[in-house]
Amino acid sequence: MNFNHFDEQGHAVMVDVSSKQETMRTATAAADVIMSAELLAAIARKSVSKGDVLGVARLAGIMAAKKTDDLIPLSHPLSLHSVSIEFDQDPAACRIQARCTVRAFERTGVEMEAMTGAAVAALTIYDMCKGTDKSISIANIRLLYKEGGKSGLYRREEAA
């Protein structure tokens, strides 16, 4: 397995993408927030004491995706064209899935931006609700979809 984030001496380096072709890059990532049924219902009713949990989490996820290169040491600073955060509430599983989709016309992929956006949206849900439900957990941060660039299309097969 070849890791291109290391030079011949084993030092971490930012990969040189200057010779790569700019193409439209898209990535979608998700993170699951598991909580009590009571808290999930309160979030849906927008009756959590700290306010509109999903509205704040949406903004936090968008902001985080734009700051990825400040957080992940070897990621490239990118000019993002679009960041969206969506939430799917699953009462049967007591879960909210935060999903982040990022698009950019760039020389490198936007997977890390999508993963960062989904993760921070999930962390924000936790932060706004931790006083109500101490058992909240965040699980399964993952890439769902990516396209663009030399490696082409990737789509994760998710169980229904």
Curated annotation (Swiss-Prot):
Q: Name one GO molecular function term.
A: cyclic pyranopterin monophosphate synthase activity
Its annotated pathway?
A: Cofactor biosynthesis; molybdopterin biosynthesis
Q: Could you tell me which NCBIfam families the record lists for this protein?
A: moaC (TIGR00581), PRK09364.1 (NF006870)
| Protein's UniProt keywords contain Oxidoreductase | no
Q: What is this protein called?
A: Cyclic pyranopterin monophosphate synthase
Reactions it catalyzes: (8S)-3',8-cyclo-7,8-dihydroguanosine 5'-triphosphate = cyclic pyranopterin phosphate + diphosphate
- Described function: Catalyzes the conversion of (8S)-3',8-cyclo-7,8-dihydroguanosine 5'-triphosphate to cyclic pyranopterin monophosphate (cPMP).
Annotated positions binding substrate: 74-76, 112-113
The UniProt entry's GO biological process terms, in alphabetical order, are:
Mo-molybdopterin cofactor biosynthetic process
Q: What is its EC number?
A: 4.6.1.17
PANTHER family, alphabetized? CYCLIC PYRANOPTERIN MONOPHOSPHATE SYNTHASE (PTHR22960:SF29), MOLYBDOPTERIN COFACTOR SYNTHESIS PROTEIN A (PTHR22960)
Highest rank taxon of the organism? Bacteria
UniProt similarity note: Belongs to the MoaC family.
Entry keyword Lyase = yes
Q: Which gene does this sequence derive from?
A: moaC
Q: Which Pfam families match?
A: MoaC
Alphabetical UniProt keywords: Lyase, Molybdenum cofactor biosynthesis
* Complexes and interactors: Homohexamer; trimer of dimers.
Q: Name the residues annotated as catalytic in the UniProt entry.
A: 127
